[in-house]
Swiss-Prot record:
The keyword Nuclease applies. Coiled coil: none annotated. Keywords: Endonuclease, Hydrolase, Nuclease, Restriction system. Its EC number is 3.1.21.4. It is an enzyme of class 3 (hydrolase). Disulfide bonds: none annotated. This is Type II restriction enzyme NspV.
Amino acid sequence: MTILTIEALRTEAAIFSAAESIHPEPLLYGVTDGKAVGTYIEQKFRLYLKEHYEFVQGNSASGIDFPGLLVDVKVTSIRQPQSSCPFKSARQKIFGLGYSLLIFVYDKIDNSTNRTATLNILHTIYVSAERTADFQMTRGIRNILANEGNKDDLIAFMSDRNLPVDEIEAGNVADEILRNPPMQGFLTISNALQWRLQYGRVIERAGQEDGILTVYRNNP
């Protein structure tokens, strides 16, 4: 059986999105829980791939759906395009999550006549790992560096932005930024016990920025 690659994952995601958008599903009729819809799509997509490809499946230890490819699948409604992900380190907000995202953005339509639901996949977007940092955080840091900012400026900025780090860690992160300036991120990441990821900007910018790819778009 063929080994799954990132290119194949994106190709199959486009095919899956088109098929799912015209599939009437009785199990989802009347379901309003976004998590249930997300689980449905993730499991169905994984089973679809297993028919054709070999790949390492994610588990609670790896924390992502395709650990062999360093890709996690996210499913979100167009009405509120966001989801959560595990908080590992405050550095993720600056340097990225450490893995890429494959995001399915759907609009759920219930049909009361035949009591089915259709998940109209409006956008499927691939965000490469280096673009998964927070937009405003990375833009501010890159502006500081462009204007001859130093370690003190970076620490003050992180404090102003309420990055969840103590003074020592802020100094370590500032040193790392000076050694390895971050790329511009495109997610909006809110501080919480889990990161809250918001996808409005990647939906807007898909296909216009390096590392943010339009895998599928449903043209009405």
